[in-house]
Swiss-Prot record:
<feature type="compositionally biased region" description="Polar residues">
    <location>
        <begin position="266"/>
        <end position="284"/>
    </location>
</feature>
<keyword id="KW-0966">Cell projection</keyword>
<feature type="transmembrane region" description="Helical">
    <location>
        <begin position="227"/>
        <end position="247"/>
    </location>
</feature>
<dbReference type="GO" id="GO:0034625">
    <property type="term" value="P:fatty acid elongation, monounsaturated fatty acid"/>
</dbReference>
<feature type="region of interest" description="Disordered">
    <location>
        <begin position="265"/>
        <end position="295"/>
    </location>
</feature>
<dbReference type="GO" id="GO:0043025">
    <property type="term" value="C:neuronal cell body"/>
</dbReference>
<dbReference type="InterPro" id="IPR002076">
    <property type="entry name" value="ELO_fam"/>
</dbReference>
<feature type="transmembrane region" description="Helical">
    <location>
        <begin position="26"/>
        <end position="46"/>
    </location>
</feature>
<protein>
    <recommendedName>
        <fullName>Very long chain fatty acid elongase 5</fullName>
        <ecNumber>2.3.1.199</ecNumber>
    </recommendedName>
</protein>
<dbReference type="GO" id="GO:0005789">
    <property type="term" value="C:endoplasmic reticulum membrane"/>
</dbReference>
<keyword id="KW-0443">Lipid metabolism</keyword>
<feature type="transmembrane region" description="Helical">
    <location>
        <begin position="64"/>
        <end position="84"/>
    </location>
</feature>
<feature type="transmembrane region" description="Helical">
    <location>
        <begin position="112"/>
        <end position="132"/>
    </location>
</feature>
<dbReference type="GO" id="GO:0034626">
    <property type="term" value="P:fatty acid elongation, polyunsaturated fatty acid"/>
</dbReference>
<feature type="transmembrane region" description="Helical">
    <location>
        <begin position="175"/>
        <end position="192"/>
    </location>
</feature>
<feature type="transmembrane region" description="Helical">
    <location>
        <begin position="150"/>
        <end position="170"/>
    </location>
</feature>
<keyword id="KW-0472">Membrane</keyword>
């Protein structure tokens, strides 16, 4: 393992240059191998998990899901608050912010973004709960790609650009996750389901987030500072991939639903729905609708 660590990290250091000394010795950041292994284990469970559960009854994780989603809601709220206040204290420039001119605020941003990176490891549990509950239709290419890639991307971000212009996407994403995980936590409580109407708008907010992140990243390309240009190009390419995948999800999920309802009304037989769907819910007249979770 030590030989592998040296080989992998030596190659990365040669390719990208020296790491930011502020994160030296931080949990999971010194070596890339643990992040690779966590990702490989995640992908293995995605592959083997549904097969393992195929002839087994689904596991009801309702109580655990409430606690899990509440925990991620609070963590996301903490990160959003700390990032916003850190950016304000450091007088960050929206158009371009380097990684060394914010003073103590940079240190605060680095600390919060480590938690953001670590939260991507915690969020692997999203997929594991799908597998245990046999909601395999929710384990999509979008879902797996987004979860697996974010952990790895943020390992690199934390080691080379752990503050400065990196704050923007994480700040928006933390806010979106407050909405998203509060929704999924509440959806695990039967009495709350009739009041949950905003799932569609979460996807719209995510798409808006990607567009805003691309806009802010492009600003740094047009009015550059000392933030590495290569990271900005990569960020925009990644945002484009997410816009394509999330946009495809949105069109298939919500446009199809609208078209289906229009046909039902034209036939004079519109069916009643309760305003939301989730893996626990069942609709009236034994009509069951299943939608993919987008993140």
């Amino acid at each position: 393992m030590e030989v592998l660590d040296k080989a992998v990290n030596g190659y990365i250091d040669h390719l990208l240059g020296p790491k930011d000394p502020r994160v030296r010795g931080w949990l999971l950041l010194d070596n890339y191998v643990p992040t690779i292994l966590f990702t490989a284990l995640y992908l293995f469970i995605v592959w083997r998990g549904p097969k393992y559960m195929q002839n087994r009854p689904p596991v009801s994780c309702r109580g655990i899901l409430v606690v899990y989603n509440l925990g991620l809601t609070l963590l996301s709220l903490y990160m959003f608050y700390e990032l916003v206040t850190g950016v304000w204290e450091g007088g960050y420039n929206f158009f371009c912010q380097d990684t060394n001119s914010g003073g103590d605020a940079d240190t605060k941003i680095v600390r919060v973004l480590w938690w953001y990176y670590f939260s991507k490891l915690i969020e692997f549990m999203d997929t594991f709960f799908f597998i245990l509950r046999k909601n395999n239709h929710q384990i999509t290419v979008l879902h797996v790609y987004h979860h697996a890639s974010m952990l790895n991307i943020w390992w690199f971000v934390m080691n080379w650009v752990p503050c400065g212009h990196s704050y923007f996407g994480a700040t928006l994403n933390s806010f979106i996750h407050v909405l998203m995980y509060s929704y999924y936590g509440l959806s695990a409580i039967p009495a709350m389901r009739p009041y949950l109407w905003w799932k569609k708008y979460i996807t719209q907010c995510q798409l808006t987030q990607f567009v805003l992140t691309m806009t802010q990243t492009t600003c740094a390309m047009i009015w550059p500072c000392k933030f590495p240009m290569g990271w900005l190009y990569f960020q925009n390419c990644y945002m484009i991939s997410l816009i394509i995948l999330f946009g495809n999800f949105y069109i298939k999920t919500y446009n199809k639903k609208t078209s289906s309802r229009r046909k039902e009304y034209q036939n004079g037989s519109a069916s009643a729905v309760n305003g939301h769907t989730n893996s626990f819910s069942s609709l009236e007249d034994n009509v069951k609708q299943r939608k993919q979770r987008q993140d």
